[in-house]
């Protein structure tokens, strides 16, 4: 797939723009849908899931790195404020949520071809980018605060829903039930509604988002620790 995309992209670069653009888009679209087609036609399709998770996680780390670069301006002497600290806490909450799911909860030995894992990371990447962009807009007095708040929460929603959607591939005792999904959705909806109501006050919006993401992470951590203690042997020196 990578080879096909490379060939078509280089071929597109050699052609006139009115032809090259079609070849380029064909290459992108073909390699986007090929994993689905291949796994449907090849019943013995196998994948090294731990290796795949490791590689995708590296891309997520890079995306979080871009978020850190976006936050760097908030930690200068001229711009440092309570927003800087709250944004950093939000980023940590999202980071812990992601790696709690994909580094600890997911079953790396289960029957998972990895296709859903791959495609579900597109909204994760898009969500993180949307959050990064929104951070500067929320504190910009010239920005439309209702739109900035909506865009910010759309990013969080994309990220969180994509992460939680992989819960069906977790270890058997760590698969989320309806109550877990409902509680996570409830936390998000409360945060969204309150933030939209106070969208004219950036500090309030950022504070609500901080508490919301923290509540989501605490809920996941409590679920993970309780289930692990009950059905598995914890390997935590702290306990």
Where are these regions (language model features)?
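N-terminal signal-anchor/initial transmembrane insertion module
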Residues: 205-209
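Predominantly late transmembrane helices and immediately cytosolic-facing juxtamembrane segments
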Residues: 1-22, 29-196, 210-239
């Amino acid at each position: 797939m990578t080879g096909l995309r490379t060939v078509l992209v280089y071929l597109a670069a050699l052609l006139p723009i009115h032809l090259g653009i079609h070849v380029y888009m064909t290459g992108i679209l073909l390699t986007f849908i090929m994993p689905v087609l291949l796994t449907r036609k090849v019943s013995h399709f196998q994948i090294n899931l731990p290796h795949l998770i490791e590689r995708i996680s590296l891309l997520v780390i890079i995306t979080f790195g871009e978020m850190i670069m976006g936050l760097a301006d908030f930690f200068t002497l001229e711009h440092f404020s309570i927003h800087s600290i709250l944004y950093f806490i939000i980023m940590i909450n999202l980071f812990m949520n992601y790696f709690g799911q994909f580094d600890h909860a997911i079953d790396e030995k289960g029957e998972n071809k990895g296709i859903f894992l791959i495609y579900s990371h597109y909204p994760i990447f898009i969500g993180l980018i949307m959050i990064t962009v929104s951070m500067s807009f929320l504190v910009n007095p010239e920005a439309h605060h209702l739109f900035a708040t909506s865009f910010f929460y759309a990013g969080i929603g994309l990220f969180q829903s994509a992460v939680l959607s992989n819960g069906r591939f977790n270890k058997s005792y760590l698969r989320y039930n309806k109550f877990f999904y409902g509680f996570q959705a409830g936390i998000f909806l409360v945060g969204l509604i309150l933030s939209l109501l106070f969208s004219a006050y950036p500090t309030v919006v950022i504070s609500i988002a901080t508490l919301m993401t923290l509540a989501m992470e605490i809920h996941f951590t409590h679920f993970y620790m309780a289930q692990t203690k009950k059905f598995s042997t914890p390997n935590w020196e702290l306990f």
